[in-house]
């Protein structure tokens, strides 16, 4: 998934503090608005608690205050990936082969930006998703947003 330059810079900046606390940095997204939002997703083998989010928020805030990479007003959110886990990296897609995924593309394919299907394969920067029984190939750089689809 193509991260913006700011998102790449933020990821590099906060990876070490998050991992030092014993958590995986799943990914982050910066949502521009009147008051923007920096949403950081963390995970661990034991799951994530509110206290975990508070600890990460404290550490990340300190780094962001010193480095000051964001020039606009924003809110910081720390979250677990949840049931509709976002997928950010090639490794995420690889890990969830066989799972259902919802994709939103940057540039439409076959006049569609939204796709729903099962992750079949990951090959470099391309993924194959089975959609209605037919395999479709997507470039990770063209995926704006990807989330697992939970089944109950």
From Swiss-Prot:
Report the InterPro entries cross-referenced here.
Ribosome_maturation_RimP, RimP_C, RimP_C_sf, RimP_N, RimP_N_sf
Task: Name one matching Pfam family.
Answer: RimP_N
Role summary: Required for maturation of 30S ribosomal subunits.
NCBIfam families assigned to the protein according to its UniProt record, in alphabetical order: PRK00092.1-1
Query: Where is the protein localized?
Result: Cytoplasm
Q: Does the keyword Cytoplasm apply?
A: yes
SUPFAM superfamilies noted in UniProt: YhbC-like, C-terminal domain, YhbC-like, N-terminal domain
Q: Which Gene3D superfamilies match?
A: Ribosome maturation factor RimP, C-terminal domain, RimP-like superfamily, N-terminal
- Answer yes or no on keyword Cytoplasm: yes
Q: Which terms under GO biological process does the entry name?
A: ribosomal small subunit assembly; translation
The record's GO CC annotations read: cytosol
Q: Give the keywords, sorted.
A: Cytoplasm, Ribosome biogenesis
Q: What PANTHER family does the entry give?
A: RIBOSOME MATURATION FACTOR RIMP (PTHR33867:SF1)
Name listed for the protein in its UniProt record = Ribosome maturation factor RimP
Q: Which family does it belong to?
A: Belongs to the RimP family.
Major localisation: cytoplasm
- For this UniProt entry, which segments traverse the membrane? none
Q: Where is the signal peptide?
A: none
């Amino acid at each position: 998934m193509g991260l913006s330059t700011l998102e790449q810079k933020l990821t590099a900046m906060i990876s070490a503090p998050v991992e030092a606390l014993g958590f995986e940095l799943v990914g982050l997204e910066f949502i521009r608005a009147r008051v923007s939002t920096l949403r950081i997703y963390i995970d661990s083998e034991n799951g994530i608690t509110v206290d975990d989010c508070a600890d990460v928020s404290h550490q990340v805030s300190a780094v962001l205050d010193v480095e000051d990479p964001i020039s606009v007003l924003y809110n910081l959110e720390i979250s677990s990936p949840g049931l509709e886990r976002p997928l950010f990296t090639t490794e995420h897609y690889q890990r969830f082969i066989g799972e259902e995924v919802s994709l939103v593309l940057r540039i439409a394919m076959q006049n569609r930006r939204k796709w729903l299907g099962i992750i079949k394969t990951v090959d470099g920067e391309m993924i194959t998703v089975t959609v209605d029984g037919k395999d479709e190939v997507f470039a990770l750089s063209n995926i704006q947003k990807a989330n697992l689809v939970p089944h109950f």
